[in-house]
A protein has these predicted regions:
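Short, well-ordered surface patches within globular domains
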Residues: 26-100
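A well-ordered secondary-structure block
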Residues: 91-172
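Bacterial N-terminal signal peptides that target proteins for export
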Residues: 1-11
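C-terminal motif of bacterial Sec signal peptides marking the signal peptidase cleavage site
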Residues: 19-23
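Sequence-pattern detector for short linear motifs
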Residues: 8-9, 37, 138
């Protein structure tokens, strides 16, 4: 009888641990691997879509975006998690902003994350549509960062199980 109680207790602990690991709707993403082919396309489309502003790709801003990518992935994961824990999300966003502030080293720049659901292919049209949809948020983000006349950008892209994240860093 004592062995049976111990076995039941061990099984119960195992079941509880398994339930905790699978409780959230979005599993933690794999390490943020860059999709360099899509990244090149997004950079080209961004230059084409921003030709009126003479946008150019800047390798230094792309490097900043790359260094911020892992924390940006964690922020999107926290936002998409179910049930959502606002403390985890706010901590992830704060960490993303801290890494960004450290990496930009005083440059005036804005971090602009854009994510697409996994069923949505990232194309020039979907990128333009996302910008049109998020235009007010993007403008507000740029202005808060002090970027009033964007001319340079960097971009990294990662495909996760639940989404594709396009992470822009925009500067004057």
């Amino acid at each position: 009888m004592k062995k049976m109680k111990r076995l039941v207790a061990v099984l119960l602990v195992g079941i509880m641990a398994l339930a905790m690991l699978t409780a959230c709707g979005v599993t933690p993403s794999a390490p943020s691997m860059r999709d360099t082919a899509l990244e090149r396309d997004v950079a080209q489309w961004t230059v084409e879509l921003g030709k009126n502003q003479n946008l150019t790709l800047d390798p230094d801003l792309t490097e900043i975006s790359n260094k911020c990518l892992p924390t940006a992935v964690k922020a999107v994961d926290a936002r998409l998690a179910f049930p959502r824990d606002w403390n985890v999300y706010n901590d992830a966003v704060k960490k993303r902003e801290t890494v960004f502030a450290e990496e930009r080293k005083g440059k005036t720049a804005a971090l602009v994350p854009v994510d697409f659901p996994s069923g949505t292919e990232v194309t020039k049209d979907t990128l333009a549509h996302a910008y049109a949809t998020l235009r007010m948020d993007v403008q507000s983000n740029l202005e808060q960062a002090g970027v009033y006349d964007p001319t340079k950008f960097g971009v990294t892209v990662t495909k996760q199980k639940e989404y594709t994240l396009v992470l822009f860093v925009v500067s004057e």
